[in-house]
Each structure stands twice: as structure tokens, then as C-alpha cells.
Amino acid sequence: MQAIAVWTLALAIGQTGSADDAYFEAKIRPVLVETCFKCHGGTKVSNQLRVDSREALLKGGKNGPALVPGQPDKSLLLKAIRHADEELKMPPGQKLPAHVVKDFADWIQQGATWSTSGKIHFNPRQHWAFQPVKNAPPAEDPSGWANHPIDRYIAARLCEHGLKPVEPADSRILIRRVTFDLIGLPPTPAEVEEFVIAWDAASAKPQAAWGKVVERLLASPRYGERWGRHWMDVVRYADTAGDNADYPIPEMYRYRDYLIDAFNADKPFDQMVQEQLAGDLLARQGQPDKFAERVVATGFLALSRRYATAPYEFMHLTLEDAIDTTGAAFMGLTLRCARCHDHKFDPITREDYYGLYGIFASTTFPYAGSEEFASMKLPRQHFVPLAPNAQKIMADYRQRLKELPPQIKKMEAEKGNKQAQEKLNALRAEERLLHRLGLPADVPGAYAVQDGTVVEARVHLQGDPDKLGPPAPRRVPKFIEGKPVVFPADGSGRLQLAQWLTRPDHPLTARVLVNRVWQQHFGQGLVATPNNFGLRGEPPSHAELLDHLAGEFVRHGWSIKWLHRYILQSKTYQLASNPTGGLLAKDPNNRWLGRFSRRRLDAEALRDAMLAVSGRLDLKRPGPHPFPPIQAWGWTQHNPFKEIYPSNHRSVYLMTQRIQRHPYLALFDGPDTNTSTEKRTTSLVPLQALYLMNDPFVREQAEAFAKRILALSPESERRIAWAHEIAWGRPADKVEIAKGVDYVNRYKHELKRTAESGERLELSAWTSYARVLLTANEFVFVD
């Protein structure tokens, strides 16, 4: 095994005093080590530039010398960290704090002397994310703006960068913002007015009114649908297996519903982690009434993508997907990079990787179907019955499958007997159905995993499963193991892995989760790379705040609803989105959170909002998708399963595939179901505008909305005012009402030329106006 790389950086020894040494050691070296060495030191050198010695900086890289002692303005190093050149910004994407830039400028001005201490040792294990969580109290805000701990952390960074927060948002903006955030739907006019009155009343306590709204939304069943969908992005949820023919998984909806119910019930996150990795094992240890949901939870692993055309073909790639998603979802680590060799950046070895590989190789994954399913008359396999005592049922099922062939053979011998032929056809149909189902027809099952034969994996040389290297006993990554984890001889070790991940002192699990929640509330995480907390990921913008949230999250029982309450109570969340006082110029990406970031509704929220405003949203939970009967399955790689099932249910219930993305979700930046989606892109492209103008779905919602408007009142002014309230969360002003009435009248005038008249003409005109409201920025964006 290669030893974990510890990069020893040979430093030039210059003539310098102890004061210069102290300055370099305190202010320059730590920044080079933490920020620069991962790309410009050790085994990794970008653009031929090294920063591990004074000589290397004097020599420079592709762009020339990086350091000109005594001349800061001629030093490319300083130009890069000042972000003064569009093509030369280091570190990329985020500027170092102003005081750090000044430290480098002063250091260069004073001659850029280098430490005489000889050597600097940089150990990747010292990376910030691998250190224990430190819940340090925030400093007091001298301005008096911050009284919540979150706000004090934010105020400190704003002050550091010479920035001030904007004013609080308007009450109507706030309730629309938090309602979309927590349940993914627009507030009703009644909900808006109730909150506005309570918030704006002179004698009222605004935060009490705010807290009441937050509690109402967290108690809504719609909350789990919204936040379950966020987690479905992370776990690469799909209703198909991903093989070449993309076979459907009719049982997969149970895992979707598990996630929705878990968020609604505020199931502690450490428990959710354990159930998703080892729910089948926990099910046999706990209460019978929890058996089914815990088994279903392992859909997280069962969802690992299948490949090729045969059952369990390229299973090593399926296991790789399980390892990679586990690492990304719970630890924010790119474990896949250690499949062929020790990780080039993070201290993860091949032995760590194949130690995890052995855990999942000791696990039995279900087979949903593939191209050979029909051609070779294969059964679905290893689906798990959702009954605690299913052994007798399964034994009877297997016995029945054994009995059927002799009975069929006997019937085949009785030619010419019509009654026997009918019975033969029935027996053949029964055998085909039972064989294909993989479970008795009347027994509910889950697409879940279960323990298999225990395997101690061997290293795959260059990642090739046909070239086996030394043994790699099951284990967790050694560099953050802490107290040794003991794996059982008679089990996969998934439960031990899950328990290790949820230790209160684990350095990654809580940090990664609170960062995901923060990202959904603010549009960007404190760590901008939620699936990569390693050395190649972005450092946190507010490291102390991240640790504070992680520590308090664990202290409050891993409660995600507690975390929502805590974040939403902050002034930072309640800021307006319009930048003032040069804030946009100084902090264009809102990294320091002096304002709220305006955001486009994501695909699901946009579709659901249209359905809600039109009055056609079906809030019932739909259950399984209407897949074809299993007897008809026979898809191939040249004719894969492809289907779209229209519905008026919430978008979380749309059937999603791996080979063919749902066209609407693809257009509006829905998640990639083949891999963990850490953060969705947000595009604004002409095709989206064309969809909103022409798609039948939008037209249907606009017409239904128009019918609601027409039913309200015969007066056009009242109709316009109400339509704005329900669509945009605010009443129309006098100018908007006048323009709206004029638009409808002119539209009706034009329609009369087409011989359209009466009720149809009225509906068409108001449908057009309704579409304007549903496609306007004020509907599509949240401030």
C-alpha cells in the first residue's frame, strides 16, 4: 500500500529576522498551505506554478514570475488574489478576505522574506473538514444589528469586508419566500393578509407572527413533499433501474413516500442515515410496526444504478455507485477517486475504498429486470417482503413454483380436452406471473437490499475487477475513523458503517447536512460544493457558522425542523433582496450574505404553483405509477422503456427515469437521476419562454385560473385585483388594474374579428391575461 501522501515542502532559506519569520509563519504560510498548495504544491502543479518556495514564486509559471519582492503592484501573486484580472483570479470563484490580501501586499512590500524554520509539513489530514466540529461562540456585533447567533457570525464577515446588510424584506415578500421555501407552494391571499396584519400592526410582536407562520408550514403535509424532493436529488432518485433498457421499478414509490413521511415526522437525521444504509437489519431488531418502513428505507442503496443487459452484469459499477453516493450524500467526499489508486487530494487510500466495497459486496441487491428479462424468461429477484414473518409465505411461494411445471407437463399431455387446455393456459399464466414478480402476488414488497454472503474484497488493480490485488478487509476510511469500528463475521457491516457515520463526534455528517439545508434556504451553501468537503472542494465562506450549526444540530437531536426554525428566525434570512450601498458591486455573488438572493422557482415549485393558482392541484398522494402489467414487459436497449404519466398531483410524484429525462423537468433544470445532484443549475433560456407561451399544460392552467377569476365577480377591476393577489401574493395597484382592464378589453376586441363571441370570447380574453400573470417574473421568481 502506498503511504498516505504527506507533502514535505522544501523552502529556500533566506536572510531574515525573527520578526519577519513570525509574520510569514502567522499570516502567509497558513494561507499558502490551506488555499494554494492543493493546486500548486506537492504532486499537483497547475499552470507550471509552484508556491512551495520563494525561488518557485520568483520563477513563476506560464504567466511569468509570480513574485517581485518590494513591488506588490508588479507581483502576479497579488494581482491574482486581488481578482484584479478577469483571467487571473485565485483562488477561483471566491476572493480571499480583504485583510488577507493586505497581509500579502505588506509581505511583498517588505521584501517577501521566507521563514528560516527549514521545512513545512502539509498533511491532508489537517484539512478543516476532517477536524472536530468547534462550536465557538460568535463575537458581539458592535453595530447592534445582530442579536441572533447566526446574525453575529454574518455581521462579523460583512464588517470584515466593509459591507452592511440591507433593510428587512416587506412582510408580503417574507411570507411568499418562506412558504415556497418550506412547502414549495404559494401562500393563499388569506394567509398573506393574516400575516401582514400581524406583522405590520403597531402593537404586534413581528417575530411572534413569523414564528406562527413557520410552525404552520412545518406542520403541513406539504412540507415533507418539498423537503423530501430535495433529498431525492441527493440520492439520485428514479423510478427506473438505469440498465440499457431502463426497466421500471413499480415498488420504488415506497422509498419516495418513506422520505416524505420521514421529513414530515421530523425523524432524527441520524436515524434516517441508519435506516437508509441498514434499515433491513434494524427492522429485525425493533418493533414490528416499524419493519416495513425500515426495509423500504434501504431503497437508498437499492437505487444504485444497473448497467448493460444481463442481471448483475458489471455489478462492480453498481457497487461503485453505492459507495460514491454514500460518500457524497453523508460525508461530502468523492470516494470514487480512490477506486484505481490512492486519492490524489484527500487522504483516502485504495484500502479504504475496497474496505467499503466489501461492505456493499456483502449485500444482496434486487434485480428489477433488463433486456434478458423477457428473452431468457428471467424472474425479478431479491425483492424484500414487507412482513416481519414472511418466511412461511415465501416458502409456500417457492413450493408453488416447484409444483407448477409438473402440473403444466401433465396438462400438455391431455391433448384435445378443452377443459384441460383452459386449465393449462391458466397454469401457464400463473407460472409466468409468479415467476416474473419475484414475490407472491398478494405480498407487498420493496425494492430494497438485504445481507448476503460476507465478502472480504480484494483491491482491483487499476480499478479492473479482473485484476485482483491484495485483500482489503472491510473498514471505514482510517483517517477519520476515530474509535475503531469492529465489523461482524456474520453480517455485511452496513449497520456498523451507519452507526459510525452518525457518531456525534463525526467531523463530516452533521456539517454536510446543515450545509444542504442552508443551501436550500439561501440558494448557496456555506460550502459551495455540498458533495465535496475535501481538499478540492470550496472552503466554507463562514467556517465558524458552519460549525456552530453542526454542533447545535446534533445537540438538538439531529432535528431538521429545529434547524429550519433556527435559521428562519435570523435577520439574515429576513433581509430584502435588493442590494443597496454598493453591495452588488462589492459582493456580486452575495457570498457574505448582506442581502437575500433572488431565485427562480425550481421546476417542481413552478409547476405546482401553476396548478395551485389554477385550482387544479390534486393534493392526494397518488401511490404507485400505472406501469404496464409485468406480463407485458420486454424492453430492450434498442426499445427501452419510455413513458410520461400526466397528472395534476404535486411534481414530487411525477415518474422519473434514468435514460429518458422527463421533458419538463429537463427543460427547467430538474435533477440528473443518474448521479447525486449536489446543486441544481438555474438557467434562463428561450426554450423555457416558448414552453410557457405554448405548452398545453400552461394553457390548461391559465384557462382554469381564468374560470376562477370570472366566477369571482362581474367587475373587471375586482377580477384584476384578485388575480394579482392569488398569483403574485400582493394586490394590484391602480396602474396595474387600469392596464389589466385595457388589456382584456383590447383582446376581446381583437377576438371579435375571429367571430368568437359570448362566454367563449370572455374566457379566451381572461385566459390570455391569466397566462400573462403565470409567466411574469413576479410569479416565476422569489425575492
Labelled PLM ranges:
Residues 32, 326, 330-336:
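Short metal-coordination and nucleic-acid-contact micro-motifs, chiefly zinc-binding Cys/His arrays
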Residues 769:
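Globin-like tetrapyrrole-binding proteins
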